[in-house]
Amino acid sequence: MHSYDYWLIIAFFAVVLVPAPFLGRFYYKVMEGQRTWLTPVLGPVERACYRLSGVDEQQEQSWQKYMLALLAFNLAGFLLLFAILLFQDYLPLNPQKLPGQEWTLAFNTAVSFMTNTNWQSYSGEASLSYLSQMAGLTVQNFVSAATGLAVLVALCRGIGRKSTKTLGNFWVDMTRATLYGLLPLCLVLALFLVWQGVPQTFAHYVDAVTMQGVDQVIPLGPAASQIAIKQLGTNGGGFFGVNSAHPFEDPTAWANLFELAAIILIPVALVFTFGHYVKDLRQSRAILGCMLALFLIGGATSLWAEYQPNPTLNNPAVEQAAPLEGKEARFGTTGTVLWSVTTTAASNGSVNGMQDSLNPLSGMVALVNMMVGEVIFGGVGAGMYGMLLNVLIAVFLAGLMIGRTPEYLGKKLQAKEVQLLVVTLLVMPVGVLVLGAIAASLPGPAGAISNPGPHGFSQLLYAYTSASANNGSAFGGFSANTPFHNLMLGLGMLIGRFGYILPVLALAGSLAMKKTAPIGQNSFPTHGPLFVTLLTVTILLVGGLTFLPTLALGPIAEHLSMGF
């Protein structure tokens, strides 16, 4: 590693951790309707939205009504995007006259962007019109991120409130999350990216002749606006097929740094938002400590693995520093590894190199980051409510060990809450192991694997893990654009999204109705090093014990077979 690599890592953490506490407080004030510095500008717009849609911002909802509103909104978004993708050849802003998507691919794409997964079985510049990218995908990037933020806020209210049946108003939370939480940051980042060289235009693709005399089509489009929200909203779906490895998506070192930091900026800020809701920022610091510990363990492992020479090229005539296959030379090994670990620690899925080219241990780190439920920062809202589920599981285990009724911040965890927690523990195994086993056992779907042996199994395992974790990244050698995989991966995305959201809202409703008992000396503290250790071990054990056999068949077997 060179000095540049160390400065990149330091700058990355600085850009994320310095503004995060202030942004977290801002989100708390926004979501609770308190006045902020943006209120004079956006307040009239917010009130106009309520008047036009007939929403009473003072009318709160029970968890059941909140859930129904969320499901109805997401269904409407799916149907609209599905229609746009099917009939894009009849719609405007299609200068390349691209045809509509085949229906299983359109289903997969619509589910992918509605669930904040952004799995892409297509190449954007070769398959989608400007309208589909802008009015279809970009809109869903905003509202899917806002949905996750709204669910987190509902859970925070459930934990922080007492003896109430309401969790807020879904329509109000969605409006505030989009208007205040996402749009201003995206505007700033989009303008910055345009300055750095990312295109934002409706012009036709450019026909050019290369220095070798070969004709080439250079794709353009309204890319900067979509890239801003794909990073900040932990969406990850690229405007271009190779995502942020494309020079039009990630043209400079500065663009690379801020796009990378944008992946986890809001998820880290929302950790502090939770602390404001429960009036105890010590809880936020403990949770963030756990997230950082898991992130640093994975990052260090991945960096070490990627700087090892490839033993299959163990030849004195071959000089090796670090394997560069699948990496952009302008970003280098450290820049690619840092992005790989960050994009899978958050449910982002964007890449600036090829995940399929990672060494086996680095690929395993990416898999484990997703298998633990995308709780190491995770998606906007989704990562934090996933982490809070693990916090409650850790509290329950601590209660069993010391022989007391488990409680968290004065709320007792009883049979109903534990049952809901168990339901969430089954989401990833069902999505990854059940759906993945079906795909692996059938000769047709298994034909999507491009490599024999352990790496081929890793390709399939990665695809179904990514879909179920709502991540969206992929091992590029996996040919996913088949009717079977389009439908099965779409099902995995739905399970991974709503298999968490529905129990989380039910849990929030149950906790909101409980009284808060005073926290005494005999209560198990959830803000110290002991609890951080317990929480970290809980996350690793739940994920590790469930998926260790599949990891042994994939990346671990590949690592050993290569002779590392």
Curated annotation (Swiss-Prot):
Domain of life (superkingdom): Bacteria
Membrane topology: Multi-pass membrane protein
Assembly and interaction partners: The system is composed of three essential subunits: KdpA, KdpB and KdpC.
Membrane-spanning ranges: 4-24, 67-87, 135-155, 179-199, 254-274, 286-306, 382-402, 420-440, 487-507, 528-548
Gene Ontology terms for molecular function: P-type potassium transmembrane transporter activity; potassium ion binding
Keywords: Cell inner membrane, Cell membrane, Ion transport, Membrane, Potassium, Potassium transport, Transmembrane, Transmembrane helix, Transport
Localization (cell): Cell inner membrane
Pfam families: KdpA
Similarity remark: Belongs to the KdpA family.
Subcellular location, principal: membrane
Coiled-coil features, chain-numbered ranges: none
Keyword Ion transport among record annotations: yes
Function according to Swiss-Prot or TrEMBL: Part of the high-affinity ATP-driven potassium transport (or Kdp) system, which catalyzes the hydrolysis of ATP coupled with the electrogenic transport of potassium into the cytoplasm. This subunit binds the periplasmic potassium ions and delivers the ions to the membrane domain of KdpB through an intramembrane tunnel.
GO cellular component, one term: plasma membrane
Cysteine-cysteine disulfides: none
Organism of derivation: Pseudomonas fluorescens (strain SBW25)
Protein name in UniProt: Potassium-transporting ATPase potassium-binding subunit
